[in-house]
Swiss-Prot record:
Pfam families: UreF (PF01730). The lineage of its organism: Bacteria, Pseudomonadati, Pseudomonadota, Alphaproteobacteria, Hyphomicrobiales. InterPro entries: UreF (IPR002639), UreF_sf (IPR038277). This is Urease accessory protein UreF. GO terms for molecular function: nickel cation binding. The keyword Transcription does not apply. It is found in: Cytoplasm. Belongs to the UreF family. Keywords: Chaperone, Cytoplasm, Nickel insertion. GO terms for cellular component: cytoplasm.
Amino acid sequence: MPEATAGPLSAEQGASLYRLMTWLSPAFPVGAFSYSSGLEWAVEAGDVADAASLRDWLGAMLEHGAGFCDGVFLAQAYRAVEAGDDAALRDVAELAAAMVPSAERHLETTAQGKAFIEIVRHAWASDGLARAVGACNGALAYPVAVGLVSATHRVPLAATLHAFLHAVVSNWISAGARLVPLGQTDSQRLLAALEPAVIATGDRALRASLDDLGGATFRADLASLRHETQYTRLFRS
């Protein structure tokens, strides 16, 4: 998005901002509220017990785990669509669907990806969307779905990437607020505290290639596996 000015947005800038705010709003019905990315087990196990430990947990997931990897998948899917490279898009889609640590995390990303595409297909159709989805030839991970939709709508990549990561972190915080629990003010303090990490992770993902993918959030990955057999659960992951 352009630097701040006193003048109005252009029609294209206004449309891009409007669509990002809509697609990545908590009100957009992809079912994000029902997933915790393993956080529910982390609270059960005592790894996350208050605002400070939640901040550390989410910061690690963002910078060294699913947040960064999903950002790379989004950017690579966007660029493949922009270049008209169906083979590259298919490779990104397959890798994104495979590179998850548990069955529940696979459900989380592919169910949201499917819902996102279906809603956009009916309400925000664009030239090239059907071809891009068809090229993927299988389940679509959520970041890949967001990347290819934004590319077909010509929404700027950097803005899409930062908005996506903000939405992901916001959903994690929402889950944490219900589980720890946290109040509304603490939740907003946490979101504000993670702003630099969201920006830095978005910038890093924008410059990264698929060769840079990887993570070091083993406890978060194990939490997503342990959640599958957790006795009492609020969330699907």
